[in-house]
């Protein structure tokens, strides 16, 4: 599938799990999870 999020960012392709868990490469770069931001 082409619609992968953070495709190969951690050495393996992430799908919707990246979106939901905030583990997607794009998620971390553009919008870091608040729980990791210190909230």
UniProtKB/Swiss-Prot annotation:
<keyword id="KW-0800">Toxin</keyword>
<dbReference type="InterPro" id="IPR000663">
    <property type="entry name" value="Natr_peptide"/>
</dbReference>
<feature type="disulfide bond">
    <location>
        <begin position="9"/>
        <end position="25"/>
    </location>
</feature>
<dbReference type="Pfam" id="PF00212">
    <property type="entry name" value="ANP"/>
</dbReference>
<keyword id="KW-0964">Secreted</keyword>
<keyword id="KW-0840">Vasodilator</keyword>
<dbReference type="InterPro" id="IPR030480">
    <property type="entry name" value="Natr_peptide_CS"/>
</dbReference>
<dbReference type="GO" id="GO:0005576">
    <property type="term" value="C:extracellular region"/>
</dbReference>
<dbReference type="GO" id="GO:0005179">
    <property type="term" value="F:hormone activity"/>
</dbReference>
<keyword id="KW-1015">Disulfide bond</keyword>
<dbReference type="GO" id="GO:0042311">
    <property type="term" value="P:vasodilation"/>
</dbReference>
<keyword id="KW-0838">Vasoactive</keyword>
<dbReference type="GO" id="GO:0008217">
    <property type="term" value="P:regulation of blood pressure"/>
</dbReference>
<comment type="similarity">
    <text>Belongs to the natriuretic peptide family.</text>
</comment>
<dbReference type="GO" id="GO:0090729">
    <property type="term" value="F:toxin activity"/>
</dbReference>
<comment type="function">
    <text>Snake venom natriuretic peptide that exhibits vasoactive and hypotensive activity. Produces a near complete relaxation in pre-contracted aortae by activating the natriuretic peptide receptor 1 (NPR1). Stimulates cGMP production through the natriuretic peptide receptor 1 (NPR1) with high potencies for the rat NPR1 (EC(50)=100 nM), and very weak potencies over human NPR1 (28% activation at 10 uM). In vivo, reduces both systolic and diastolic blood pressure with no effect on heart rate, when intravenously injected in conscious rabbits.</text>
</comment>
<keyword id="KW-0382">Hypotensive agent</keyword>
<dbReference type="InterPro" id="IPR002408">
    <property type="entry name" value="Natriuretic_peptide_brain"/>
</dbReference>
<protein>
    <recommendedName>
        <fullName>Natriuretic peptide TNPc</fullName>
    </recommendedName>
</protein>
